[in-house]
Amino acid sequence: MPRDGMVYKLNYLLKSQSPTSPAAQQILAAYLKAAEERKIIPGTRAGEGEYDVKQSMDVIIRESPGQVLALAKAMRKRLGELSTGCLVKLAHDLLGAAPKVPAGQRAELESLLYDEYRPPLVDRLRNDMGSLELIDAVVALTALKNPNAGWQELGKERYADRIWRYTTLEPKGEDVLHHREGKRFRNITLPAELKGWSEPGFDDSGWKKGKAPIGVGLYGDSNLHFKNATPWGDDEFVLMRTTFELDSTDFDNVRVRVLNNQGYDIYLNGSKVYTYIWWCYTPEYGKGLACDKNLLKKGTNHLAVRAGSVYPKDVHVGQIDVYVEGLRKKDLLDAGKRP
């Protein structure tokens, strides 16, 4: 397998050729052979061989949809050699490429991913339920034949229908930050009446109420954005609280999904579960933040959030929505069993 310099030159040449040209086909055949045959030496040098294999796989998946199925078949015998991270990436990349492969190959590729790639990932998951990346890979492959397996939104009502109590506040004194500052999320002094605002017993009956996302301005663009369900207002920060009901807490993994453009603090039943101090560029509900499952309780659970906003070109923009998901190990691992 050529090293980085030669790989760069080959990729440059590949991009300059028609995908069906003899030169391009020869280069792609070499990459396929490298992915299939490059030796991965066990031990401390395993990463070197695996890096070369990943380079070859990436080129084929990116440049030649017509050879994705051939790559998936070629890599079957190597699945046990790959690290969990590499195997997870390969499964995700092959699954992501499925819509682009020739229509006549798509069903075979998806069956191959479910029948031959999913089992070794499940085996690894039995011993590592703490890896959200591994869980997501198994969920994605399981969804090919059982879309209901995997993460479940917690609560008896959809998060989009949930009512939040919220209030906004503008920093004062030394907490004020110029609008041109992009990194804005920070601790600020709260008024005395907001002491304990994140605790389950706090009285928020005087706050405004509405559904999420709570927002102001346009986060994203006209083609990619989530519509604000409730107006944020003019202040820089928002505090928001809601509840959800559970009949059972027998989840092996719990995670929090967040739509945000600036930083936030999240509390579950009074305990802070996550703080994010930076910003996001793309409107999406993030894949999820691992959360201590022991914080959940039967009955009413309390979710509290403090979020910030930003002022690009002096236009006020902020958006926040949060919900919780749970996963049962048995439901996921048994989902692919044949009757």
Q: For each of these PLM feature ranges, what is it?
A:
Residues 200, 205-234:
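Surface-exposed, low-complexity/disordered Ser/Thr/Gly/Pro/Asn-rich loops and linkers
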Residues 234-245, 286-288:
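Short beta-strands within extracellular/lumenal beta-sheet-rich domains
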Residues 207, 236, 244-270, 303:
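Aromatic-lined ligand-binding clefts that engage carbohydrates, nucleic acids, or primary amines
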Residues 268-289:
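Solvent-exposed beta-strand/loop surfaces of large extracellular or lumenal domains
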Residues 1-151:
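Long, ordered, helix-rich scaffold segments
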Residues 151, 156-193, 279, 290-339:
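An acidic-aromatic loop/edge-strand motif
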